[in-house]
Amino acid sequence: MFKKIKLAAIFALGISAHGIAQTPVSTGPYTFSIVKENAVGSIENQCQTGTCWSFATVSFLEAEVLRKGGKSIDLSEMYNVRITYPLKADAYVRYQGKQQFGPGGLSHDVLRVVAEHGLVPQSAYSGIKSGVTEHNHGGLDALLESTVKTVLDKKLNEEGGAWKNSVNGILDAEIGPVPSSFEFNGKKFTPAQFRDELKINAAEYVSISSFTHHPYYAPFVLEVPDNWAKGSFYNVPLQDLERITENALDNGYTIAWDADVSEKGFSYLQGVAVLPASMPKKEEWWTIIHPELTPTAASRQDAFDRFETTDDHLMHITGKSKDQLGNTYYITKNSWGATNPFKGYLHVSKNYYLMKTIGIVVHKDAIPTEIRTKLGMK
């Protein structure tokens, strides 16, 4: 929960014909200069849902379409949610209720849908029922959770897979049946054909993280609740995570970002995320630029081990900025609507990013060659 804070100034956000967000550059004591800004789509709002994983990754894929020379496209977030929920339900029952079941997920869940099914435009699948104006999954999530728990409590799995029809029926009623084909700009597509038309290949994207409890330069299953699919991440030293991030943004790539946003230094209302070295006075939080902590591999690991760093939220890093003192920030696109000073964007300090990153997804080519070699990537 964020307190409502009186903002010093509010600036408009413009979108160019090429989809490049002209991010505003001032709030409170902070004045930002844009260092690098890559082409992205429009700000969206996940509303009353826990589907940031799909919104962030879809935004990332929309940017990939632009980077590859395609036109601006509005892709469906709820298509991924609709495909993924039955997979979560099946896994929950198979693990006898001993793993996460809920609305959360990670970027590799979207990439799995892309690889196995395809992509769908928002115009073909909004996931919003007729007469409803925004996403609200409170009822949907409760119904699905009740269903899978009933399967285990009453041992309905012993009667075959009929219970799966109930899961699909709930999803069809609440967000709509999965489309087998659709029309877009006067042409008929299947989801797989549309994916190929957009030149999106899920195999080109990799998950990266940085923790010391697993060997570096090897894949590992990241132990966070929303990794229900047991997806693998490449583990790299902290300095390599920084190098990958800088190399990606400087060369026109963007980044899907999973992070902890529970710190007091993360303020969507201010549009800034920072990591103060000492706790500021309440009245000085957003009136002074404070010196920041410098994260280390050890401090990152300690925060993760103590659950001080948790997988709270996924967003989309689109560029770089600097404050008036020369500190580096990452321009970050959120999915909570255009409702803060930067119309839905934040400036996240490099220190906050390095300390609070759970994992990222990038295109393989965004990774420096020597790091790719150490990871055994072709």
What are these regions (language model features)?
Residues 17-18, 48, 110, 313:
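Generic detector of short, well-ordered, non-transmembrane alpha-helical segments enriched
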Residues 27-216, 220-227, 231-255, 340-342:
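Active-site nucleophile-adjacent alpha helix/oxyanion-hole segment immediately C-terminal to the catalytic cysteine
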Residues 5, 41, 53, 316-317, ...:
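N-terminal, helix-rich and Lys/Arg-enriched segments in bacterial and organellar proteins
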Residues 24-29, 292-294:
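Short, positively charged
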Residues 165-378:
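Active-site signature of cysteine proteases
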Residues 7, 12-14, 45, 107, ...:
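A broadly tuned, weak detector of single residues within folded domains
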Residues 1-24:
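Bacterial Sec-dependent N-terminal signal peptides
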